[in-house]
Design a protein with these regions (language model features):
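Membrane-embedded transport module
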Residues: 4-171
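Active-site-proximal beta-strands of protease catalytic cores
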Residues: 1
Length: 171
């Protein structure tokens, strides 16, 4: 570590040079780094939950004997449109001084913590239960209203993912 006003030999020997000669820059950089790491974790929670629910609903929908509850086009729309905007929203959460109160993590720690895993599985199972309940309800409908019911299923799936995004943002 060297200061910006230090000698050129010190600057060349150091890994980091503080151009403004302020040690507060180190604390600010740590805060931004921890906040970025937390935002990445938030996106992982969002992404794994949405994919767990989507894949499980297609699999269980096939087991229940319905048409594909989510078509390839709908899955593509979810992955391209919803995930892109969710990534921007979750990545733009500003840093908070609260991250400085957390203990430093080990470099060997896995990015998915046990509480994140519980959140992913818990929310995923809850969403899946709602969607499977709707599929069972759809199976009792006349076949002429099935396209409308599949549209309602997709709308319910998208609305649950909006809730998932807000859930991930407060994680």
């Amino acid at each position: 570590l060297s200061m910006g006003t230090g000698t050129s030999v010190a600057k060349e020997a150091s890994d980091i040079t503080l151009l403004d000669d302020s040690f507060n820059s180190i604390a600010t950089a740590v805060m931004w780094g921890r906040s970025l790491y937390k935002n990445i974790q938030r996106f992982i929670v969002f992404q794994l939950t949405i994919n767990l629910v989507a894949l499980s609903s297609v699999l269980l929908g096939a087991i229940f004997g319905t048409e594909l509850p989510l078509t390839v086009t709908q899955m593509l729309w979810v992955n391209l449109i919803m995930d892109t905007f969710a990534a921007m929203a979750l990545a733009s959460i500003p840093p908070s001084m609260d991250v400085m109160k957390e203990k430093p993590r080990k470099a060997s720690d896995f990015i998915i913590t046990p509480s994140m895993l519980k959140n992913i599985v818990g929310v995923g199972v809850a969403f899946l239960a709602l969607l499977m309940g709707f599929i069972i309800y759809m199976n009792n409908m006349p076949t002429d209203v099935l396209p409308m019911a599949l549209t309602q299923f997709f709308t319910l799936f998208v609305m649950l993912q909006f809730w998932n995004m807000f859930n991930a943002s407060v994680f």
